[in-house]
Amino acid sequence: MTETTRESHLTLHRGGFPAGVTKVLSLGDTRFVDIAFYMVKLEPNTTQEVPPVFHQCAAIVLGGNGRVTLCPKRGEELPAVEVSRADLFTEPPHSFLLPRGAGMKLAAGDRGLELALCSVPGQGQAKPVHVPPDQVRCEERGEGQLAGTFHRQVRTVADSSNAKGWGFVFGEVVNQAGRWSSYPPHHHPQPELYYYRFDKPQGYGHAEIGEQVVKVRAHDFTLMREGEDHAQVSAPGYAMWYLWVIRNLKDQVYDTPEFTEEHRWLLSAK
């Protein structure tokens, strides 16, 4: 395995995450993405406080049920939001955007509660924001093209259309078994992080990161440098889900990807 592959493919958490807060990446851990990632996992009927964040942060509910209370600043609380998510593959998430200095109080219900926290440098907007599932933009991409071999569902939670002024764009992809996503291969000037889950414990897929190809399993991460081509495929029999987070550059907010020239013909292929 090359040094580039070790930096771009993280596999330390394949056994899953324990209760509590687990740091996967902090800002500055990698030389090229500068995206922090923490997993927050609560046992049923327990609580957890997320103290005021030092940089703007996105919190995405991955599973369970409970209440999320946003705290714009110390001593101030917004009304609690009831959240629930039974299945990554069929339900869009509740998500929360936290500016610098804001925090959260979490109270798990009878199914526990699990959230991903993703942070990038900067302030963000002035106030925290809740993006409920019915405001997530869900698109069926690649449907009806090349026998559905790259048909997938893309869920965009936050981008320039609804989260202007934030330092990130993020969402999810549901990759059907045996099919491609993030396809045709593409790149963009902004760095990106993927976090993976599968519908079966033994599920797996493959990720292209530039000229490297890696085998991905549940709880793996891949990291894409600025301008680095990437695409994904899930093994037959195993549906794949992944969270994607793009860090906006100071003078270049992510809008659309740039597809690799030799594969652009696939955009209109039947």
Region locations from a protein language model:
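Conserved hydrophobic/aromatic beta-strand scaffold that supports enzyme active sites
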Residues: 37-41, 58, 95-97, 117, ...
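Non-transmembrane, aqueous-exposed alpha-helical and coiled segments at domain scale
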Residues: 2, 10, 14-18
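Glycine- and acidic-residue-biased ligand/ion/polar-headgroup-sensing regions
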Residues: 53-78, 177-178, 183, 189-221, ...
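A short glycine-rich, His/Asp/Glu-containing loop-to-beta-strand
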Residues: 15-49, 56, 145-192
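Conserved metal-binding segment of the jelly-roll/cupin
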Residues: 89-109, 120, 215-237, 243-247
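Double-stranded beta-helix
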Residues: 87, 111-153, 208, 243-270
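Extended, compositionally biased flexible segments
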Residues: 29, 37-108
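Short, structured patches in soluble enzyme cores that scaffold and shape functional sites
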Residues: 100, 108-110, 117-122, 158, ...
